[in-house]
Amino acid sequence: MRGGLWQLGQSITRRLAQADKKTIGRRCFASDADLKKTVLYDFHVVNGGKMVPFAGWSMPIQYKDSIMDSTVNCRENGSLFDVSHMCGLSLKGKDTIPFLEKLVIADVAGLAPGTGSLTVFTNEKGGAIDDSVVTKVTNDHIYLVVNAGCRDKDLAHIEEHMKSFKSKGGDVSWHIHDERSLLALQGPLAAPVLQYLTKDDLSKMYFGEFRVLDINGAPCFLTRTGYTGEDGFEISVPSENALDLAKALLEKSEGKIRLTGLGARDSLRLEAGLCLYGNDMEQHTTPVEAGLTWAIGKRRRAEGGFLGAEVILKQIEEGPKIRRVGFFSSGPPPRSHSEIQDSNGQNIGEITSGGFSPCLKKNIAMGYVKTGNHKAGTNVKIVIRGKSYDGVVTKMPFVPTKYYKP
């Protein structure tokens, strides 16, 4: 088991570093002095956080628990993640929705106020610039959270199109929430523990919904969402209140909710079948190929109007040439870039994320295969260090999701 734990930690570290390199380039592998720190940095260190460079930040990859134990504890009890390296921003103005709908695939206009959805920023070729959660606070206020490794290019992309939009009379402005920190509270104890710290009734707040409310005496943006497949919340809190909130959440859980690092977060999202940008989705990958067609609203499919719509809508109609799928496999855990072959030894694709599942106690992976080889039950070979091992295409998520829905 010790060898399996070591392999799990090493594979996750490599996977995060690889996604980091692809999305942000060399500049993030700087000296410790050049790395940014969240307001909880000292709190992480005091609590045994193993700090590593990620997206230009010094972030905890794990604490005293193993990545395997942290993953299982999140699903059985709960986890508290510091995800303040991610970028929250607000778009405001009467033309905010038509502006944003030029850049993303979501039916933002169709969202009810106080609800959100996963979406994708696309380029002119239909490729993914980044994935993001978009929330309609009101018809004139949209709240977004984008990936840390994509922050610079995302903001440059939005700003470039905003300047053009405003030059034609469009009413839209933005605010980047650098004054706030972001905590992710995930797992079955997330809601009951958070309920201790707010007067709002969380039992009537469902997956994908958003509220502005008081938590532990601080004005917070609360979204019922996450990156683990579990029920949970992302809490945008004024940075001066972040430490007190983190301590209060851990205290109220009586030790059952634990501080959890990027390692277990990656393991959890892989078990949930969720993409890691830079690995499972890149600028040459379309949302259709990535299995995110469901995120393109019916109206958007009919009207288009977003960057790359011609390419994406054609793929919806005719089908993509490649598709993201899940795998179970034998042998060593698959790694990113491991070759996928059919039963005749012909190349049909490539692994993008893979590892040992702490919850299923078996190898899981996702990757892209040529259409025709994508159906669940299809037998494949996965090549690892020159040797081929048996694999089978399987449906995702690997671990059933537990989102809180009415």
Curated annotation (Swiss-Prot):
Give the main EC class. Answer: transferase
The organism's superkingdom is given as Eukaryota
Q: Does the keyword Transport apply?
A: no
Amino-acid positions noted as binding substrate in the UniProt annotation, renumbered to this chain: 234, 265, 403
Q: Where is the transit peptide?
A: 1-29
Q: Name one GO molecular function term.
A: transaminase activity
Q: What this chain does, per the record? A: The glycine cleavage system catalyzes the degradation of glycine.
Q: Which family does it belong to?
A: Belongs to the GcvT family.
Q: What is this protein called?
A: Aminomethyltransferase, mitochondrial
Q: Which gene encodes it?
A: GDCST
